[in-house]
Amino acid sequence: MASKSLVVLSACIIIGSAVPVEKLPVLKSQPAEVLFRESQPTVLECIIEGQEEGVKYTWTKDGKDFKWTEHNAAQRTNEGSLVFLSPQPSDEGHYQCFAQTAAGVASSRVISFKRTYLVAEPAKTHEKTPVEGKPFQLDCVIPNAYPKPEIFWKKSLSGADPNADSANLGRRVTAGPDGNLYFTTVEKEDVSDIYKYVCVAKSPAHDGEVRLVEYIIKEVTKDTSGYKGELVPQYLSKDIVAKVGSVTMIYCMYGGKPQGFPDYFKDGKDVNGDAGGRITRHNRTSGKRLLIKETLLEDQGTYTCEESNGVGKPVKHSLKVTVVSAPKYVKSPEKVIIAKQGQDVTIPCQVTGLPAPKVTWTHNAQPLSGGKTTVTESGLIIKGLQKGDKGYYGCRSTNEHGDEYVETLVQVN
């Protein structure tokens, strides 16, 4: 029988180890992005889990050594975590933490440290006098912000408690992804001296809501154009690139009277769906939006909405949905592998993504190349494990839509 065997050892398997797995020094996982508000204290975490003394922590920023003592920052006691006391735009960058332990040098994923902001002028109130019975829209410019804010509309009673505001605007009224509010038709019941239509933004840059613009519909005028209620386009989604796992919304918004109700097709197949389904037009928009709650690769295709209200000609709109995927692990890799000297060991790191991710490996924070290691689609194989092979093995996978990083501590008995 051969003296070597190929084994993949789970973190729960311990072969002759005197140290419990949960006490071995591994870095706590970090997020891919940390946001900060200018001048508000913010923490970049770097913590060794397990029982380990004398850990030496260092950081890089944008690939260069970062000396926190030369910046307005502090390091938490017994941790590598950085506390930016009053972060400024100049502190933005890509940070990586390194922890030197008795087992080797552990490294974090690269963390994007970005300022969150939203630039908006004080909200102004505008009075509108639309034409009765015709499609209509109220404009709301999405402000310069990071990340992109959530925009929504509500109906607000002048002088009343903001908590009494209503987000129920009625079946004829729908907010578009461009920030604007669309009326299938505007009617006399929309007129009010005391109610305002208010466009609001939510952002991690602010506590609470930020009012962007307010409108009062003072009155409606009679139509003299001869419009009969035929369907006219208001907001129609263009081609979409959607990420696996994300929410995708396809808008098919036509104005007209009576109000139509779109039917949706994917590659010619009905995808209207049922209320509560993963794909459904039943999502409180009177069918004006097809909702894909969790996008899958199979959702790629050509989508068409068709609508008729019995006045004028039926309408149709088509667009393409292209589905992409950031790197994702097929199975969560182990944080710790403990193996005997002389064994062949596989460190699992199987990744999917579209386009196919590029996978790179490090050993104790240094690029790994050739030698006794072999990279496969399922992970990294170490031939004839020796004491010098112990340490932290990092697997980083990247494509244009994201990146993932996982690190495995290999202990040799």
Swiss-Prot record:
Residues covered by the Ig-like C2-type domain: 25-112, 122-211, 233-322, 327-413
Further information in the entry reads: The recombinant protein is recognized by an antilonomic horse hyperimmune serum.
Q: Name one Pfam family in it.
A: Ig_3
Annotated GO MF terms: serine-type peptidase activity; toxin activity
- Where in the cell does this protein reside? Secreted
Q: Which tissues and organs express this gene's product?
A: Expressed in larval bristles.
UniProt keywords, alphabetically: Blood coagulation cascade activating toxin, Disulfide bond, Glycoprotein, Hemostasis impairing toxin, Hydrolase, Immunoglobulin domain, Protease, Repeat, Secreted, Serine protease, Signal, Toxin
> What EC number(s) does this enzyme carry?
3.4.21.-
Residue positions with a glycan: N283
Sorted alphabetically, which InterPro entries does this protein's record hold? Cell_Adh-Cytoskel_Orgn (IPR050958), Ig-like_dom (IPR007110), Ig-like_dom_sf (IPR036179), Ig-like_fold (IPR013783), Ig_I-set (IPR013098), Ig_sub (IPR003599), Ig_sub2 (IPR003598)
Q: Which SMART domains does the annotation name?
A: IG, IGc2
Query: Which Cys pairs are S-S linked?
Result: C46-C97, C140-C199, C252-C305, C349-C395
Similarity section: Belongs to the hemolin family.
Q: Which Gene3D superfamilies match?
A: Immunoglobulins (2.60.40.10)
GO-annotated biological processes:
homophilic cell adhesion via plasma membrane adhesion molecules; proteolysis
Under which name does UniProt file this protein? Answer: Hemolin
**Any one GO cellular component localisation term in the record:** extracellular region
Where on the tree of life does the source sit, at the highest rank?
Answer: Eukaryota
Role of this protein: Bristle toxin involved in caterpillar defense by participating in hemorrhagic syndrome characterized by a consumptive coagulopathy. Exhibits procoagulant activity through selective factor X proteolytic activation. Activates factor X in a dose- and time-dependent manner but does not activate gamma-carboxyglutamic acid domainless factor X. Its activity does not depend on calcium ions. Also functions as a growth stimulator and an inhibitor of cellular death for endothelial cells.
Q: How is its activity regulated?
A: Increased activity in presence of phospholipids (low concentrations) and calcium ions. Inhibited by PMSF.
First-level EC class: hydrolase
Q: Where is the signal peptide?
A: 1-18
